[in-house]
Each structure stands twice: as structure tokens, then as C-alpha cells.
Amino acid sequence: MAEERPGAWFGFGFCGFGQELGSGRGHQVHSPSPLRAGVDVCRVSASWSYTAFVTRGGRVELSGSASGAAGGCRDAWASEGLLLVLRAGPGPEALLQAWAPDSALRGEPLWAHSVVPEAVEEDDPGGEAQIGRLPLLPCARAYVSPRPPFYRPLAPELRARQLELGAEHALLLDAAGQVFSWGGGRHGQLGHGTLEAELEPRLLEALQGLTMAEVAAGGWHSVCVSETGDIYIWGWNESGQLALPTRNLAEDGETVAREATGLNEDGSQVKRTGRVEDGAPAPFIAVQPFPALLDLPLGSDAVKVSCGSRHTAVVTRTGELYTWGWGKYGQLGHEDTTSLDWPRRVEYFVDKQLQVKAVTCGPWNTYVYAVEKGKS
């Protein structure tokens, strides 16, 4: 059996601050473009104005409004308020450093904190690139917020496995595959059926009994993928980021007939369509406060998910990439700036015979890791 060739990272979308996105010409890239240093990169974290790349050799490199590089790094997490860098410390400890982006990796950090990691998880089979765990700390007992108070403890009984931060809310996936949400809820992004805020992590009851494998937080929407490959999505649908019919795109002629299944408060299913048969106006969805079950074309199973501010990207079990939502800067990768309220496959990777393994979205851009098909 031949060894699998190393993969590469690709980028597309907004690059108005000079952050590396493939060719990086102008302020936007409309189609996936290889990163110049993509072969050596193993993790990517993108904020609005800059991106942090972590290499396999443990080096973090910044591109965009923030610049600089440093070695001895395990992970990095970029936000407009803070750059977090996890560095190897003495013995089993790791050192978490926080920097202001405009002075990142120069002089002394704003603050530093020693953490003792839990057992390191093995990479997926094949050794493909993994997305970092920050802002969840390696001890899984706390996380870091880009706004004060920066260090926020988590109840030990939560047994956090993954934590994602939106603009105003947080999602947590625990070791049992349950989802918790808290923070602002004015766009339904918490999934509890109301627009009320939650001060503490609250179990997402609509998904009880379903084991989730991944969660992702957009600016004001949320997505999770189950172990069986199902997608559940909720929150704000202003730009079609939920793949549900939205008035904004219908007025632009972008909405097409399709169907999605939602969950009522009692767990019963309700179906909504983009157009009804008699031509009557569609029941547009502005806010979806409960998880909706979303089917990809051809019944494809999802394995990875990431969200931008108002767009969503999903990787299927067969290595295809689907994107939808806000596309003004080409962040959907469809060679245009069209916004979509339905999942569309990114044909670039199909045409190039590439299998997508990972995706991570910045607010207005998207980064993808892919390998050549048939080389393993």
C-alpha cells in the first residue's frame, strides 16, 4: 500500500488586511487557492483581520494586521481581542500566553498561565491536520474569553471535549456527546426555543438522546454534527447561513425550492419548504430558535463543520466540501460573491481530485485542508 501524500491548505474569502489566502491578490479570493506554506501547516485559526498558522514543527506564524512568529508552540487561537498561544512548558505543564494582536509575540505577553494538560488525544488515522482545541484549555476545566474576565472556569461535571465561541454565545460538547450553550440568545443561537440569554451552560434538551461528534459557533448561529453524520443547525438566518429559506436572498432570486426538517419544543418535526406548490410566498425563516435537521444533497453524511460570521462549511464522509450563507467576499469558494441559503458543493476540490479532511472558518474567510485522492 502506497503512503498517503502530505496534504495542503487552501484559503478563500476576505484578505483585506494582507492575511495569506493563497494568491492573496486584492482584498478577496473567490476560489480555493493553495497557501504558500500550506504543506507545513497543521493548524489554522482565523480572526477578522489576521490569521495564525501553526506548523508541524511547533512554530506559530501570523499573517495580516498582526505579524510575527515564535517557536515551541502547541496551539494558537486568534481573535480581535486576544491572540492565545499554548507553548510547551517544563515537565507535563504547558504555558498559555495571551497577547494583544497589535503587539503579538513581541516583548512580554499581557498575561501567562500554567496549565497541566489531560492525556493528549491521538490524531485521526492518516495523520491529517487537526484543528486546535483552544480556547478550551488542555485541562478541560476552563476556557479563555477574548473579553474580560479572560480566564473562565467550567464545572468539572461538564467534562468538556470541545468549546466554540460565537460573537455573543458559547457552545460546549461534553465527553458523552451532549451539547450545552450559554451567553446571548437574541438570535436564537442557544437553541433553547427562546431569545433569552443564559448565564450558565444549559443542556440543549432538543438534542438529548443524540450523540454529537462536533460543534461549531458562527457569529450568531450554531451547528453540530452527530456521530452518524446528521447536521443540526439553529440561530440567525439573515444570510441563509442555516440553509433555510431567507427573505433577503429570495428578493435577490437566490432561493430555490427545497426542504428542511426542524424540531418543535416537544420534539415533534415540522417541515418548511422554500416555495409552496401553489406559488404562495414561502415561510421565510429569520430566526430558528430550535435545532433543525439539515439534509445535504445526495444524503451525504457530515464529519466536520465550521462557521464564519454568517456562513457555514461542512466536510462529508467522502471528503467533499459544502458551503452556504453569506458570500460577499468569496468565502463560499464558488468562484463568485453570491450568498446562498442552500448547501452547495465546492467543485474546485472535486475537479482537482482532492479529498477534503478539515475546514476552519474565519469570520469572512475559509481555510481547507485536503489530500490527493487514491494515494493511500
From Swiss-Prot:
Repeat among keywords: yes
InterPro entries for this protein: RCC1/BLIP-II (IPR009091), RCC1_domain-containing (IPR052830), Reg_chr_condens (IPR000408)
Annotated localization: Chromosome
Assigned GO CC terms: chromosome
(3R)-3-hydroxyarginine, modified sites: 141
Listed Pfam families: RCC1
Intervals holding RCC1 repeats: 6-56, 176-227, 229-317, 318-371
Keyword Nuclease in annotation: no
Major site of localization recorded for this protein: nucleus
Entry's transmembrane regions: none
GO BP annotations listed: chromatin organization
Residues covered by region (Interaction with KDM8): 1-169
Keyword entries, A-Z: Chromatin regulator, Chromosome, Hydroxylation, Repeat
Protein name: RCC1 domain-containing protein 1
Species, as recorded: Macaca fascicularis (Crab-eating macaque)
Gene name, Swiss-Prot/TrEMBL: RCCD1
